[in-house]
């Protein structure tokens, strides 16, 4: 992982940007992977893909329905297959589900074909973003906040293996988060060239 936790902004300032590898957004549910990823793709002029949306489209059902009908293990297998397929294409921005980066095979595949960017948010920020949503199957428990805390504590060590880390503090706009991600990516000339 980048030794710097990127929380300063740098913009493209009208210059051209050349993306050489797929940017894979990783992190907890509620970290902003989809919102920031979509805005980043627009700023860089590359496609935005969402692994969860691709899975839902292929299965013709929602993630919670897949979890309920087929279980988490089935979902994780499909998730790995979809990510592998999406990484084969031209460089883009790919948002992944919160659990995708947990599998060692997925981390290796992402490292070989892209660059992982961990949107690091603290537990309070995450809870404030997800507590009113019923689309998170892993939080359908008697104590969803305790469940989120347990997931957070288990996942952070794996997320810390990401190539780059960008702080998502809950007070920064999506556009400012995109600036932070671009600043982090710009430290990797094999990933992003700014001119």
Swiss-Prot record:
It catalyses: shikimate + ATP = 3-phosphoshikimate + ADP + H(+). Keywords: Amino-acid biosynthesis, Aromatic amino acid biosynthesis, ATP-binding, Cytoplasm, Kinase, Magnesium, Metal-binding, Nucleotide-binding, Transferase. ATP binds at residues 30-35, 136. Its cofactor is Mg(2+). It is found in: Cytoplasm. GO terms for molecular function: ATP binding; magnesium ion binding; shikimate kinase activity. Pfam families: SKI. Its main location: cytoplasm. It comes from the Bacteria. PROSITE patterns: SHIKIMATE_KINASE (PS01128). GO terms for biological process: amino acid biosynthetic process; aromatic amino acid family biosynthetic process; chorismate biosynthetic process. Catalyzes the specific phosphorylation of the 3-hydroxyl group of shikimic acid using ATP as a cosubstrate. Belongs to the shikimate kinase family. This is Shikimate kinase. It comes from Ruegeria pomeroyi (strain ATCC 700808 / DSM 15171 / DSS-3).
């Amino acid at each position: 992982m980048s030794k710097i936790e990127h929380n300063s902004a740098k913009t493209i300032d009208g210059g051209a940007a050349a993306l050489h590898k797929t940017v894979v957004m990783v992190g907890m549910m509620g970290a902003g992977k989809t919102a920031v990823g979509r805005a980043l793709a627009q700023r860089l002029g590359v496609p935005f893909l969402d692994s969860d949306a691709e899975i839902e489209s292929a299965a013709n059902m929602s993630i919670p329905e897949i979890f309920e009908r087929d279980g988490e293990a089935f979902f994780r297998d499909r998730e790995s297959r979809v990510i592998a397929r999406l990484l084969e294409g031209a460089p883009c921005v790919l948002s992944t589900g919160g659990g995708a980066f947990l599998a060692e095979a997925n981390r290796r595949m992402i490292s070989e074909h892209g660059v992982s960017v961990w949107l690091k948010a603290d537990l309070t920020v995450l809870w404030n973003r997800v507590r009113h949503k019923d689309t998170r199957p892993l939080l359908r428990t008697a104590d969803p906040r305790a469940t989120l805390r347990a997931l957070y504590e288990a996942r952070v060590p794996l997320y810390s293996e990401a190539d780059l880390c960008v702080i998502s503090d809950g007070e920064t706009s999506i556009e400012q988060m995109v600036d932070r991600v671009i600043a982090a990516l710009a430290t990797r000339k094999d990933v992003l060239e700014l001119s």
